Amino acid sequence: MTTPQIDERAMEAGAAALQETIVDPGPLDVTALAVAAALAAGLHSAADDPAAALDKCIVLDELTEFAEKLVVHDRPGGIGTTVEYVEVYEDASGVRLGTATGNAVVLKMEPHMWQFHQSVSELADGSFEAVGVIDCTAMLRRMTQVLRVTGRSGRYAGKSGFMTLAISDPNQRPPHYSVQVVLC
């Protein structure tokens, strides 16, 4: 079955992840992510209790992300191929929290596919932008990717931090991703 607004390659990404012979999940727990964000914001020192970083930041944990719309504009050889997408965020109960609208550009195809990503996430309490370069091959092996996040409006305005992204359910079509966002 093809969903008209999602490119078939995106729908099959979970199947590709299931076929990977090297599965190496490396989740970064939310406390470690908060320490990194608080250190980057100058609100935390290495000597501080790691758990204290959680109190200094806005933490969005146990989010699920999946494609609602994904369009690929192919280029010969793959490099320069662009992707436009709208992703849905749900909480642990399956309640829709908002969307991320963004784009990606394929930077390199071999031996790993590297992509530049930029998106703006709109939630009821504000928005933030995520930017970074991710290793899609590593992601198919269920390795966690980290993007830089900057608050744009609402309770996120003026704050910065990080977002993690990892395939959580490759059996879904499109696959579901586990997301954590921490801004300080």
Curated annotation (Swiss-Prot):
GO terms for biological process: antibiotic biosynthetic process. Disulfide bonds join C57-C184. Keywords: Antibiotic biosynthesis, Disulfide bond, Isomerase. It catalyses: 4-[(1R,2R,4aS,5S,8aR)-2-[(2R,3R,5E,7E)-3-ethyl-2-hydroxy-5,7-dimethylnona-5,7-dien-1-yl]-5-hydroxy-1-methyl-1,2,4a,5,6,7,8,8a-octahydronaphthalene-1-carbonyl]-2-methylidene-5-oxo-2,5-dihydro-1H-pyrrol-3-olate = (1S,3R,6R,8R,9R,11R,14S,15S,19R,20R)-8-ethyl-9,15-dihydroxy-3,4,6,20-tetramethyl-21,23-dioxo-24-azapentacyclo[20.2.1.0(1,6).0(11,20).0(14,19)]pentacosa-4,12,22(25)-trien-25-olate. Pathway: Antibiotic biosynthesis. Disruption phenotype: Cells lacking this gene lose the ability to produce pyrroindomycins. Homodimer. The N-terminal 10-AA residues are absolutely required for enzymatic activity. This is Spiro-conjugate synthase. It comes from Streptomyces rugosporus. The lineage of its organism: Bacteria, Bacillati, Actinomycetota, Actinomycetes, Kitasatosporales.
